[in-house]
């Protein structure tokens, strides 16, 4: 059964996705071989077209039941405020993501992400507009820095921080080193010996602590004593309304303090100009790495910013240190994940998608577009970016052993490159 490329392009255009001809019928469970049949019941045509690897484009090498490893921010509930919005991907959205949760935070000009802190570390990547970052350490050191597209911040667990939008529209990818970011923690009363009584009488608390909420729940006479001010209703307008974003005007004030500003290895911010693009040996794109080697404070989240040329392949590899959490910024991708036990599954990704590859699972990522670069971020709950290349491993193993292991002629192994290619054109 043959179907013209014009049909492929037409139906893909309806869904707003890149056209790639996998054969069969686009958007239908009919493969090139003739296997399958049309959908006769309810279905979502746009989702079907965006995920050909589930239907007509499903590789024959996909075997077994592999859990869903993909989420789209477009499926997340958006919390809207005067001054911006937030939408998250947490473990209830993507249960396979144990290490990292993510969010998109949008601020209008002057919009402030409320002063707060977390019981986990927060990492952020600016991809639209620019922001002012404000932070204070337990030692009274402070930081005020302007971040523009590509720049990164990292706030350790418990660090006091906030940020404000500077341009008309500003947006940040935020990640936390805890997949179950919104989980409720418990403080157990010590006077119950029975665990059921402890659970029923536990005090719950969440991951984020907000300054305005804390002040609103503190007696005013205590606030007056703490801040050395009069008790004349100063904090009457401080509300416990959990506003994560508030509207304001762009800050023009500077700050000085006796313990000085955060600088050097202690800085909470990183400017992407300090991580030049690496032109990889494979010639298929570039990689920028930001981890504790060049951003020392970022001890629990490491990042690689990857750009693949049209048709390029992020080579077959795995990561020895952690799960890989992904955010796709632009373009269209295809990836097959091998999770051992003979199980593998292929996924399609587009801009705004997140994904996770299980700890040490083998995989590749391919740019399926013919004319658009693929740009995505790899994040790890680790202090460094690390991967093991399958091709390099085979090339650096005695060639007769490697050839026997995968049952290929030895000259196939002889031709493999001994340096890591990263991205292959």
Curated annotation (Swiss-Prot):
EC number: 4.1.1.2
Signal peptide start and end residues: 1-19
Recorded catalytic activity of this chain's protein: oxalate + H(+) = formate + CO2
Cofactor: Mn(2+)
Keyword Secreted set for record: yes
Annotated CDD domains: cupin_OxDC_C (cd20305)
Record-linked InterPro entries: Bicupin_oxalate_deCO2ase/Oxase (IPR017774), Cupin_1 (IPR006045), GPI/OXD (IPR051610), RmlC-like_jellyroll (IPR014710), RmlC_Cupin_sf (IPR011051)
GO cellular component term of the entry, any: extracellular region
GO MF annotations, alphabetized: metal ion binding; oxalate decarboxylase activity
Primary location: secreted
Positions of the catalytic residues: 378
Domain of life: Eukaryota
Free-text comment on the cofactor: Binds 2 manganese ions per subunit.
Glycosites: 228, 247, 254, 265, 367
Binding site for Mn(2+) 1: 116, 118, 122, 161
Official protein name in the record: Oxalate decarboxylase ARB_02208
Protein's organism: Arthroderma benhamiae (strain ATCC MYA-4681 / CBS 112371)
């Amino acid at each position: 059964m043959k179907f013209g490329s014009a049909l492929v392009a037409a139906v893909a255009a309806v869904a707003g996705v890149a056209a790639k001809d996998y054969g069969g019928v686009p958007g239908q469970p009919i493969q090139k071989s003739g296997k399958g049949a049309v959908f006769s019941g309810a279905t979502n045509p746009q989702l079907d077209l965006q995920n050909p690897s589930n239907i007509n484009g499903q590789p024959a090498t996909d075997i077994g039941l592999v859990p869903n490893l993909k989420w789209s921010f477009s499926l997340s509930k958006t919390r809207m405020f005067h001054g911006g919005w937030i939408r998250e991907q947490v473990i209830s959205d993507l249960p396979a993501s144990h290490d990292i949760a993510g969010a998109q935070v949008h601020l209008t000009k002057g919009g402030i992400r409320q002063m707060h802190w977390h019981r986990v570390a927060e990492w952020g990547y600016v991809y639209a507009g620019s922001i002012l970052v404000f932070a204070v350490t337990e030692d009274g050191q402070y930081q005020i820095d302007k971040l523009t597209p590509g720049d990164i911040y990292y706030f350790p667990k418990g660090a006091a921080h906030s940020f404000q939008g500077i341009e008309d529209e500003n947006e940040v990818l935020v990640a936390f080193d805890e997949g179950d970011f919104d989980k409720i923690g418990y403080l157990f009363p010590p006077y119950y010996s029975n665990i059921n009584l402890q659970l029923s009488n536990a005090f719950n608390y969440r991951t984020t602590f907000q300054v305005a909420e804390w002040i609103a729940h503190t007696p005013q006479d205590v606030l007056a004593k703490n801040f050395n001010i009069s008790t004349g209703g100063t904090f009457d307008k401080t509300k416990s309304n959990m506003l994560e974003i508030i509207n304001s005007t762009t800050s023009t004030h500077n700050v000085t303090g006796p313990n000085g500003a955060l600088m050097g290895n202690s800085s909470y911010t990183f400017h992407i100009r300090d991580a030049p693009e690496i032109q990889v040996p494979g010639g298929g794109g570039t990689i920028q790495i930001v981890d504790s080697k060049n951003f020392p404070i970022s001890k629990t989240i490491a990042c690689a910013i990857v750009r693949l040329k049209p048709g390029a392949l992020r080579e077959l590899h795995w990561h020895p240190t952690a799960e890989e959490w992904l955010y796709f910024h632009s373009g269209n991708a295809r990836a097959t994940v091998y999770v051992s036990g003979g199980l593998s599954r292929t996924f399609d990704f587009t801009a705004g998608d997140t994904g996770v590859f299980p700890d040490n699972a083998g995989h590749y990522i391919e740019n399926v577009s013919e004319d658009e670069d693929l740009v995505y971020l790899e994040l790890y709950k680790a202090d460094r970016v690390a991967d093991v290349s399958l091709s390099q491993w085979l090339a650096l193993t005695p060639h007769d052993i490697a050839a026997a292991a995968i049952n290929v002629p030895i000259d196939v192994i002889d031709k493999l490159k001994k340096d890591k290619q990263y991205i292959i054109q």
